[in-house]
Amino acid sequence: MPKTFAALTGALLLAATGARATEWPDYGGSPDQSKFVVTPDLTKKSVTRLEMAWMYSTDDERAYQFNPVIVDGVMYVLAKNSSLVAIDVRTRKELWIHANLRGITNRGINFWKSRDGKDRRLLFVMDDLLQAIDARTGKSIATFGKDGAVDLREDLGRDPATIRRVASSTPGRVFENLLILGSSPGEGYFSAPGDVRAYDVVTGKLAWTFHTIPRPGEFGYDTWPKDAWKYAGGVNVWGEITLDERRGIAYLPVSSPTYDYYGADRIGMNLFSDCLLALDARTGKRLWHFQMVHHDLWDYDPTAAPQLITVRKGGRKIDAVVQATKQGYVYVFDRETGKPVWPIEERPVRASDVPGEQAWPTQPIPSLEPTARQVVEPDDLTPFFITDAERAAWRERIGKARTGMFSPPAMVESAIIPGAVGGTNWGNTAANPGKGIVYLLNQDFPSFYKLQEQSDRNVAGARNRFGPADAATLERGKKAYEQSCGMCHGVDRAGTPAGPSLLSIGTQIGMPQLRRTVLYGNGRMPPIGHLSDGQIGDILAHLGGGGRPRRPADMPAAPTPAGPVVATGGIARPPVTATVEAPQEYPAGIEVPPQRYYTDYGLGFPYLLAPPWSQIIAYDLNRGVIRWRRPLGQDLDAAKEGGKNNGVPRGSQRQGMIVTSTGLVFSTARDGVLYAFDAENGDVLWSAKLPMATEGLPAVYELDGRHYIVVNATTPHTWGLNSRESGIGSAEPLGKGGYVIFALPGKR
């Protein structure tokens, strides 16, 4: 009787919420991105008995952000030097390996199957090519697109030969027979436009396009200069797309325009940048939009998955969509009309004094309590990690800086919180849809901006040295590297969890390739627009460049992993257009500002302000109140200095949650611990140390009535001032990560 009742209860919950309890067939678990699962066996009482059931080693030292897809008893993961691996979750054996997919969408893939189940596909982007793999065999589908792939550089209204980057790190969203896809064209001047496109999952044919930078005659065209559509870029969807399957509506958090921090060549509100955009998923027709930042100058693009919930307010039920942002704001709208559920007020903000710039005079501020700190004060400094002398210097520096979240970047320093990666970011939202509760991960992370002029950016001025560099050049390169590259790649060039080692990179690439990577970004690396060609050349010298770079034929081939390899490399990128430079000047005849300005991201000080640095938050949107908030993780360096309940610097970045029907919220954290919180009050009910830290979203599947939680633990731990540690509390060899799977004890 109890088992029957539990099964009936689970079935009713499943039907009521639309959650998927037994599989994880999409990035984020389901089209609605709620991460909500029905788990009759996992309760507040039983969770204390949760234990590691098994682990799949990635057999490499790569840090993955991959969210596994689990469907029909098969788990698909990225492992073994960026290979797609299919694993039978019952036998835990590899079914097939498609090896060496370097450049694949690193956060996840898309799964689709035909109604009769005979055609099952994995769809992903690799090096700007959309392609498909047979989910049963692991082999590329040659009939998809043109010779097995669709070149995403095409159909953007620009010369494909000049587009260096389009592929997004997030996989998109499947709806019926369509794959709705965003992009990541880069964040520098003259990046490609971020059109949203939908492709037929069987043929690869382009089904519809939505121009996020409107063209003449389209709605929003008048919010830009008349020729901006010819040169402006970004306004892309690199974050997480949410789908209301019943209504056929796709909700897209649209990114900021380029260049991020100076907009004299894009005067106006700049629709549809920084919008929550609702599109008809079948046709791409705009249903409604709301712009959360006008004329963005702060890289405040929304990226977190919009959450679909039912709110009880004013005596009625409202099907709502919720967008959490980097600023710590929470916006709530009626799903069908876009009407705000909780009030939003346009408030005056500071004007810009930078030549040519026209900051928008107001910004839309929601009435709901922010989840993040929004002002930097001299008294907010951390009690950890910095000396008294450093503290005094920081107090003076912050006291002189311009502050306030919407203070435009200027020729003097601005101290902004949340910064470019603060607040709530991708992976950081989940919900109990039926109860109107949204769960958020948040971090307080300031940015320090200071604009500078940049003029020597012509390709002809680049220094591609083929001889030894002098001492002055090496010293300039060392300084430029430490200021602009050291945080991610390490001052010693040995790498950090944020970026790979560069110890041998100087002998592998030349000035043109380094310049393209710096200006336009590559994979998870953002563009660094403030460096001149001279500085890039100096950095190359510091990295050991000077001799001729090795040709691709001289580079070592990627090793073939052990196991049932059925294919390798996917569909290779066509070798055409490899030497064509992206544009560095505006089209002829267009009136543009005489000067360009740049700044770095100012992200070198994640620990600077007093903790908590990272938090998990439960927001009750029926009442419009924060129900509870708790620190997320514990920084071990701070703990050594007596700190408790501090969170971790960068502690919520690239982390994710699972919400259960039984009142649990599981969350990963940068300290390499998986936590189970009580959904009602935030108490920690259980935790487990992982062999390595995590990046990316966890997943859930069910087998024989037991639910299994899958966590991608492949990233070295970092604490406080970027000290590193791995293998905490683990029997696994140090530095060996993998997918760790937890479950309640089974029959022995």
Regions found by a protein language model. Give the residues of each.
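N-terminal pre-domain segments of enzymes
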Residues: 21-42, 360-391, 395, 554-595
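Bacterial N-terminal signal peptides
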Residues: 6-16
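Short, solvent-exposed loop/turn elements at domain surfaces
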Residues: 31-37, 61-65, 85, 260-261, ...
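Extracytoplasmic electron-transfer domains, predominantly the class I c-type cytochrome c fold
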Residues: 167, 249, 466-557, 561-572, ...
